[in-house]
């Protein structure tokens, strides 16, 4: 029986990469393939987490955190101890600590490298990591991107296109939480609700989405889920623009509450400005509930591929509040157009982004890789 290890990032889950690792681990286990995650613990708890009969999260101790990388010598030791148990190690990049652990592990089996994003922000540290990153690219038997755009455009993958492929990230459809959705809508009677979800960090471009509200009629409200280092700065912007009654930072949301906000909104908006936003699972989550999507055309990113322009919604230029406002009003102000994009969003989800389809493709790829010995 094939056994796979997902290697990288952190636990408990905070970002999209960790979420993908968990979806892979649970999805494989549901099909009867034992699968584990090996991660650095965020909170100091190193007890194993049992996800299901065939799926576990193995956690190691964090020594320090440098430039969003968890330093964990224990990760190296742990991987060396367990490496022979796995037919495939699926490494999730960017995570320098995972690359270091694999380098020193002595693992001889198949390696799949999942290229979620180039390293963009920590360019100084990239100088030191680049030789190891190059080794990781050479060591990989197969390299996955999340979209064809990112695989083709990444400067680091130009010379290895022969062993690259792409695997769109799929999720289970969100449930329609009627009572919770009704409660949220009741808080904003007669309003059109714009929802956005993601950490309050610079690459999300929330300042442009907030500014877009000054170009929209009073009937529009903007709700932004999650927390982050820019919370105070964004709250100050909201107050300076006189938008306290129309823009709300919701803070962190539990899963069910988050699902309810997706269902309650009229349109989901992603205002990201950098290719750090390589995919945006939140777009897929919104589409699963038939929410029209407005996203940005980030150069070299896969975001505008995920949100098919004039199918599941509209894509607009980055850093352009007026373009965001125009797209929002165009969809929300025309019931027939809203219905068109709502149906298109759900159809795109069904055709491309279901979890079942993703896991089927993943198992098929793993099997082919092992058969190519």
Map each language-model feature to its residues:
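Conserved donor-binding/catalytic core segment of Leloir-type glycosyltransferases
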Residues: 5, 183-213, 223
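Short His-centered aromatic/hydrophobic patch
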Residues: 91-98
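Nucleotide-activated donor-binding/catalytic signature segment of Leloir-type glycosyltransferases, i.e.
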Residues: 233-253
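Conserved acidic donor-binding segment of nucleotide-sugar-dependent glycosyltransferases
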Residues: 308-321, 329-336
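Short hydrophobic beta-strand element within catalytic cores of glycosyltransferases
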Residues: 288, 292-297
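A short, well-ordered alpha-helix in the C-terminal region of glycosyltransferases
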Residues: 246, 323, 330, 337-352, ...
């Amino acid at each position: 029986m094939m056994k796979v290890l997902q290697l990288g990032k952190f636990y408990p889950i905070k970002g999209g990469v960790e979420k993908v690792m968990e979806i892979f681990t649970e999805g494989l286990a549901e099909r009867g393939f034992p699968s584990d995650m090996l991660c650095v613990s965020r909170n100091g708890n190193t007890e194993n987490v049992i996800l299901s009969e065939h799926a576990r999260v193995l956690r190691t101790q964090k020594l320090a955190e440098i430039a969003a990388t968890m330093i964990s010598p224990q990760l190296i030791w742990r991987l060396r101890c367990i490496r022979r148990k796995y037919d495939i190690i699926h490494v999730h990049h960017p995570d320098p600590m995972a690359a270091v652990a694999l380098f020193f592990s002595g693992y001889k089996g198949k390696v799949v490298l999942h290229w979620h994003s180039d390293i963009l922000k920590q360019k100084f540290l990239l100088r030191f990591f680049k030789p190891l990153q190059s080794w990781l690219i050479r060591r990989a038997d197969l390299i996955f991107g999340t979209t064809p755009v990112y695989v083709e455009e990444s400067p680091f993958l130009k010379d290895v296109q022969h062993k690259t492929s792409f695997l769109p990230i799929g999720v289970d459809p969100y449930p329609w939480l009627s009572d919770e959705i009704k409660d949220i809508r009741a808080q904003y009677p007669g309003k059109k609700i714009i929802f956005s979800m993601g950490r309050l960090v610079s690459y999300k471009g929330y300042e442009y989405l907030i500014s877009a509200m000054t170009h929209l009629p009073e009937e529009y409200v903007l709700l932004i889920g999650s927390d982050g280092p820019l919370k105070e700065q964004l709250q100050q912007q909201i107050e300076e623009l006189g938008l306290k009654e129309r823009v709300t930072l919701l803070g962190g949301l539990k899963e069910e509450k988050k699902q309810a906000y997706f269902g309650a909104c009229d349109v989901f908006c992603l205002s990201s400005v950098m290719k750090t936003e390589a995919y945006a699972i939140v777009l897929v989550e919104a589409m699963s509930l038939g929410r029209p999507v407005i996203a940005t055309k980030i150069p070299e990113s896969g975001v505008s591929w995920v949100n098919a322009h004039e199918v599941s919604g509209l894509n607009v230029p980055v850093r352009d509040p007026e373009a965001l406002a125009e797209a929002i009003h165009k969809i929300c102000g025309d019931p027939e157009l809203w219905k068109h994009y709502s149906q298109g969003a759900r159809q795109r989800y069904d055709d491309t982004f279901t979890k079942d389809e993703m896991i089927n493709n993943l198992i098929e790829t793993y099997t082919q890789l092992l058969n190519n010995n």
